[in-house]
Amino acid sequence: MSTTIASDHRRASDCFLPAECRAFIERGALVALNHSGGKDSQAMTILVSRFVPRDQLLAVHAPLGEVEWPGTIEHIEDTLPPGVPLILAHTATGKSLLERIEERGRFPDASRRFCTSDTKRGPIERELRRYLKAHPRYGGRIVSAMGMRAEESPARAKLVPWRRNDRNSKAGREWFDWLPIHGLKTDDVFRVIAEAGQAPHWAYAAGMSRLSCSFCILASRSDLTRAAELRPGLYRDYIALERRIGHTLSPTRLPLPAVTGVPTAPASANPDL
């Protein structure tokens, strides 16, 4: 199977699209859109779907259970281009992130991000390998597209936006990792979404600057505070977990109420939030 990517530079101008990536897609590679439900994934999906044929697109999401913002999967489904399938990559054990944290007796941190490896990257790569094997029409070729941007952090600025994934390029697979919007600024991301006639996930309008776990180890103080206000029931669960394991979510080693200034939510708070 081969195809030709339309050379509409206006429509693809926000994307980083090296010649090698274009040629690989034209050879019929599957393009997997790693979708968190956040603004960057959404903008990436809009841009990539403008020039990659629909039958070569697949969206994949790693559900995070109770720590995920409500409505995330529905938001992804509502904003995907028609005809693009969505697969959900659950953890192999079925255990939630909070259960994994309690087992380990500690929260993840910047150097030990088992939240990413155990609940996102590992399950997603597993499901993509399965999908590729079940669909031989792609010839074992896959591009894993992710929405990381250089502006987000010094570490992400150093990421290579197109590279061969040697760890997954085996057993008849040829796998490349692609960061199509690596060079975009935050304003560009929201512009792309608005120009497509879409809105970002509701949590942004509610005051969050990022959409990850509701209480993320990398979140700013303001995001943690707003999350505590928006999800009092889950906030109470995190505080109780901190006390049980004797470890804090914040790298400052301050308990959440000291970080956010928000007292523990009463037991009558909505348990679904």
Language-model region placement:
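Nucleotide-activated chemistry modules centered on ATP-dependent adenylation/adenylyltransferase
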Residues: M1-L273
